[in-house]
Amino acid sequence: MCIRDRPPARSIGEDVGGLYEIWNTEATPFTTKGFEDKADIDIELEPSKGGTKFRYFQINPTPEGVPVEILNEMAADAFDKIKASHCRVDVSKHPAMHKTDSIDYIILLKGDVTLILDEDEIDLKPFDTVVQRGTNHAWRNNGNEPALFIAVLIDSEIDA
């Protein structure tokens, strides 16, 4: 049964990229009854305790010539809007570095992207898959067009 056949009810941050919520679960076990849009809630980066998030997201190319201080302010504002300021634990390698208490399954659908980690950088091409296990990371769009990803985030207890 198809519950919804339309664009996502909520999105945020289109000026720097954007998060587009497809579906959320709040905790397990979850009910399969009802027809309400589980993604029609305020957008937060992390899933709730015991919950999941299914979304696609877009990373726009970094504007040329913008000072790093301004990029840091833009990133801080973007993370604040999605209740994720606490996820920015070490931004020394990139203004959008962040770490969530989740395991994330991510597929790059379109674009030329580098995954930036604390100790490494990995170039990705369309249909490459990344499994994030509570790692501090950021995405750098190396192209001239927005990069598009699809992701499933699952709340997890991350080892320190």
Residue ranges, per PLM feature:
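Conserved short histidine dyad/triad with adjacent acidic residue
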Residues: 53-100, 134-136
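A short beta-strand-loop-beta hairpin characteristic of the jelly-roll/cupin
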Residues: 92-126
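Ligand-binding loop in jelly-roll beta-barrel domains
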Residues: 52, 121, 125, 134-158
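Conserved small/polar residues in nucleotide/adenosyl-binding loops
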Residues: 1-6
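Short, acidic Gly/Pro/Ser/Thr-rich loop/turn segments
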Residues: 63-64, 157-159
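Short, well-structured hydrophobic secondary-structure segments
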Residues: 7-60
